[in-house]
Amino acid sequence: MHVRAGALGVKSSELNIMSNEKIVEVFGSYRESVVRNRRDYYAREIGKLRFALADVSAETSFMPYVSKYVIETTVVLGAVLIGAAQFILQDATHAVATLAIFLAAGSRIAPAVLRVQQGSITIRGALGQATPTLDLIDMLGDTPMIENVDDTVDVVHDGFVSEIQVESATLTYPNKPTPAITDISLCIPPGTSVAFVGSSGAGKTTIIDVLLGVLNPDEGSVLISGLPPLLAVAKWPGAVSYVPQDVVIAAGTIRENVALGYPPEAATDELVNSALKVAHLDRFVAGLPYGVDTQVGERGAKISGGQRQRLGIARAMFTRPHLLVLDEATSSLDGETEASISEAIHALRGSTTVVMIAHRLSTVRNADIVVYLSEGKVMATGTFEEVRSAVPDFDRQAKLMGL
């Protein structure tokens, strides 16, 4: 019974995780589910998981009561057997006396035994549910505690040099036969704008993850301001900023989203409004009844997709970084807004190093350095026109886009 209780606890945790994953999945792809008419599928799958979880919960709740009936039945059967044995072996007087003593002792001991049994079953079930959490705690046991975190916003970044040096970087994802990037060597001088271009699967996002320190190369090295990426961002917080293709918007105010990760007192009007201006959100926010303290709703439900993307750009500019990394950051914007933001980012050249990925070649045309990737390798490096002359595929893409 104890083994069964432990197994039920583990199964309960697994079903909870699986059902929550499905719920997050369907909300994250709700539009696709509606268009493809797959809502019924998700409803059915989530229903199966929740019904299975209900069965496990019901059995888990019932198990402690099984002990009660087992113990009570054992006491009654024991009394019958003892009474019968005494009647056979001795006289009725001894049988009645023995039976009375047994029943009196049983009535006092049985409740205590029952409580111990029920408690042990409950504990065993709870341990099964806690197993994933305990495993995670063991994994994190050697992680040092973070102390004395500096919550001030540094916009000066004294001593930081926005130079990136990549030396023979190679990275292969687990269970993949070929490297995602192979022998990448680059030197990105301070204040320049660099664009990584190439077809899907060429390794653009991988090289960005390596530059940011999200992934460590299997071979080679990456240095930002002379240090490995994670050490650089730890030494100069806010000197490096990143804008993803899909910006995460927290349920809160515009101010809180721009200063995400910082305490409220750090989100001054000057810093927030300055960041909003770069992202061309200042006029929109100024027209709102509560300005920067306007609620954006869960996942930014109260603002448009383009405004969410610009809010992500404003967040990146909050600390006035000296190195800005853009991963398709303007892809969801309309042409006019994209041109305005590209112009604002281009104006940072000289003071801020800008590294970007873009499929719209019009946004990278004015980059100082264009790096063309194919199958994880650098095929050409130079200005837009130089790469265009060196790579026929790139020239063909440019012509298709009217460039």
Enumerate the predicted regions with their spans.
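Conserved "ABC signature" C-loop
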Residues: 247-295, 322, 393-396, 402
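Primarily ABC-family ATPase nucleotide-binding module
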Residues: 137-192, 228-233, 274, 343, ...
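Cytosolic ends of transmembrane helices, especially the final helix of ABC transmembrane type-1 domains
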Residues: 15, 31, 35-38, 62, ...
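Conserved ABC transporter NBD signature motif
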Residues: 220-228, 235-238
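A hydrophobic transmembrane-helix motif
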Residues: 1-2, 59-101
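ABC-family ATPase nucleotide-binding domain "signature/switch" substructure
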Residues: 241, 246, 257, 275-279, ...
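Helix-to-loop junction immediately C-terminal to a conserved catalytic motif
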Residues: 212
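The feature captures the beta-strand-to-loop junction immediately N-terminal to the Walker
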Residues: 197-199
